[in-house]
Amino acid sequence: MAERDSEPRVNIIRPDDEPEVEEERVPDPDMVIKHPLQNSWAMWFFKNDKSRDWKDNLRVITTFDTVEDFWGLYNHTLPASKLQSGCDYSVFKAGIQPMWEDAQNKKGGRWLINLNKTQRQTHLDDFWLETLLCLIGEGFDEHSEEICGATVNIRNKGDKLGLWTRDAQKTEATKKIGIKLKESLSVPPKIVIGFQAHSDTAGKAGSTVKNRFTV
């Protein structure tokens, strides 16, 4: 019969045998490498207050010019679907205001996607994000220079998403931008989206404005 050990075995580790614990290093924010965008952008917020002038209801939230700053902004702002009725988000190239009267916009127009109330919960946020990614990623290829910005309008009667372009007279470029937008958002082929020139829209109710182009 084997003789049992009279004392329990102890695993002795000398101090110099202890495993090293690597401290987690927090990167210096100034040393983080950011990925620049081709253009600088500004995000705007509009809240309809009828007691104030329209322009006074529009303000810049912030500007950004890197991929990381865009995601930091997007992840810390309220989703479009959660905005109150009468509110807008706009993202435009730096130096361009989200209004028809701006010199960069007045000759242009917008591709317009209308969404009903049920689509606010199912499609609006995805459509808005995909539009922004096309915007800041220069996703319209050689026609990206024609892009001014994008807006999302939250309304009781139905929401609107608009992609604003610089020159409504550039028919070929405008149509290709619309086709690319529709593809990027995976809009079903049977659903038609239209382009309206700002000169046709100014001073008219939305339902009376005719589309210049459709895709």
UniProtKB/Swiss-Prot annotation:
GO molecular function, a single term: translation initiation factor activity
UniProt key word RNA-binding: yes
PTM annotation, UniProt: Phosphorylation increases the ability of the protein to bind to mRNA caps and to form the eIF4F complex.
Oxidoreductase recorded as keyword: no
Keywords: Initiation factor, Phosphoprotein, Protein biosynthesis, RNA-binding, Translation regulation
Family that this chain belongs to: Belongs to the eukaryotic initiation factor 4E family.
Subunit structure: eIF4F is a multi-subunit complex, the composition of which varies with external and internal environmental conditions. It is composed of at least eIF4A, eIF4E and eIF4G. eIF4E is also known to interact with other partners.
Function: Recognizes and binds the 7-methylguanosine-containing mRNA cap during an early step in the initiation of protein synthesis and facilitates ribosome binding by inducing the unwinding of the mRNAs secondary structures.
The protein, known as: Eukaryotic translation initiation factor 4E
Source organism of the structure: Aplysia californica
